[in-house]
A protein has these predicted regions:
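Conserved nucleotide-sugar phosphate-binding/catalytic loop shared by glycosyltransferases and other
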Residues: 3-11, 30-79, 84, 232, ...
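An aromatic- and histidine-rich active-site surface loop
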Residues: 44-48, 98-117
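Donor-nucleotide binding loops and adjacent catalytic segments primarily
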Residues: 44-45, 49, 53, 176-183, ...
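Structural loop-to-beta junction motif characteristic of Rossmann-like glycosyltransferase folds
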Residues: 55, 119-120, 265-266, 283-291, ...
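Active-site-proximal region of nucleotide-activated glycan assembly enzymes
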Residues: 56, 115-178, 187
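Acidic donor-binding loop of glycosyltransferase active sites
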Residues: 96-98, 262-277, 284-285
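A short, well-ordered alpha-helix in the C-terminal region of glycosyltransferases
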Residues: 337-351
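C-terminal alpha-helical cap of glycosyltransferases
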Residues: 350-370
């Protein structure tokens, strides 16, 4: 079946937005004339990132529940009702063959209204432990595409398609790029490289741990390619400059992630869904430090899925300052463990995730509106 009109809803974080855009790109690759409309949440990241990727987006006034008693919480029931009504209007006006939910605040009202209007829905779950919205909406979905195996304990078995997370292809294309990467980042080809990545904003714990262990890393004749994030760059830059450590290569943000992965001997990362999916495709020995500041503690669950299969090492957030650098240096020296981790993490990689998800979309899409 030809896809002509599709709504994709959700967002809030890059972990929701980037897979959504990857799915949209694959739909457009196969069906260039398909009209795709995104539905996001007011004031969230998707309202900026989606138009930048070339797609139209409409906003719902939806928000999450705050743990503290606030005026915002008192307004929440009214915002939910208004978001449901607005989502209904958007769907009736756009007349999609299919609504895809990727998680995040906006996906709840949009998928709920699509189900009530008889529009097929597909849920794309990025994590090994689903969010509450996806679990609530799963029974009414026509299909659920998961990033991890063994998700039957959360979703109806007959609806599950184990596709993996769609990632940007250029991010994981690393073969034959090590020499180019060394030149690009001005690294020493004779030194082992530790890549540290904590997201575009940065990860406070990772930054503190690397800052604490900079001298030890330098003395060990190891170089560090370090993405510290926008929020921490000025403070970390002062620390690096003050110590005059030539082996510490600090970046606010790395936009050439293919080159960063290509030159890395060991990777230190948070355990967000998309980071884990990218790491599973590049096959680098990895130390994961899950963020404790996420819903359902899903980063720890993502990490443990790999750790239980000897595909990654876990360092807990509260232990990172004292343990992380030592763990990384020990891993660099352990050739057999590096090989084992690199080999095992590849078994979680799904190169054709976007293509498989679009195949499922085609199989469940509505032929036409009456």
């Amino acid at each position: 079946m030809k896809l002509e009109r599709v709504i994709i809803s959700g967002g809030g974080t890059g972990g929701h937005i980037f897979p959504a855009i990857a799915i949209a790109d694959e739909i457009k690759r196969r069906f260039p004339t398909c009209h795709i409309l995104f539905v996001g949440a007011e004031g969230k990241m998707e309202m900026e990132r989606v138009p930048r990727a070339g797609y139209k987006i409409k906003a719902l006034p939806i928000q999450g529940f705050q743990r503290k008693l606030t005026l915002s919480n008192l307004k929440l029931p009214f915002k939910i009702i208004y978001s449901l009504l607005k989502a209904r209007k958007i769907i009736k006006n756009f007349k999609p063959q299919l609504v895809i939910g990727v998680g995040g605040y906006a996906s709840g009202p949009t998928l709920k209204m699509a189900n009530l209007l008889g529009v097929p829905t597909l849920i794309q779950e990025q994590n090994s432990y689903p969010g509450k919205t996806n679990k609530l909406l799963a029974s009414k979905a026509k299909a659920i595409c998961t990033a991890y195996p063994n998700m039957e304990r959360f979703f109806p078995k007959d609806l599950i398609h184990y596709t993996g997370n769609p990632v940007r292809a250029e991010m994981v294309d690393i073969i034959g790029k090590r020499e180019k990467a060394i030149e690009h980042f001005k690294l020493d080809a004779d030194k082992p490289t530790i890549l540290v990545i904590g997201g575009s904003l940065g990860a406070k714990t990772l930054n503190k741990a690397i800052k604490h262990g900079m001298e030890k890393l330098h003395e060990a004749n190891v170089q560090v390619l370090w993405q510290c994030g926008r929020l921490y760059h000025s403070d970390m830059a002062i620390s690096v400059d003050r110590r005059n450590l030539s082996s510490i290569h600090l970046h606010q943000f790395i936009d050439k992630m293919d080159l960063a992965y290509a030159c890395a001997d060991v990777v230190i990362s948070r355990a967000g869904a998309i980071s884990v999916s990218e790491l599973s495709l590049v096959g680098k020995p990895t130390i994961l430090v899950p963020s404790p500041n996420v819903a359902e503690d899903h980063q720890t669950k993502n990490a443990m899925t790999l750790v239980n299969e000897s595909a990654a090492i876990l360092v807990e957030d509260q232990s990172a300052r004292s343990k992380l650098v030592n763990e990384a240096l020990q891993l660099l020296e352990n050739v057999s463990l590096k090989q084992e981790l690199g080999k095992n993490i590849l078994t979680f990689g799904k190169k054709q995730a976007a293509e498989q998800i679009v195949d499922v979309c085609i199989s469940i899409a509505k032929k036409k509106w009456k």
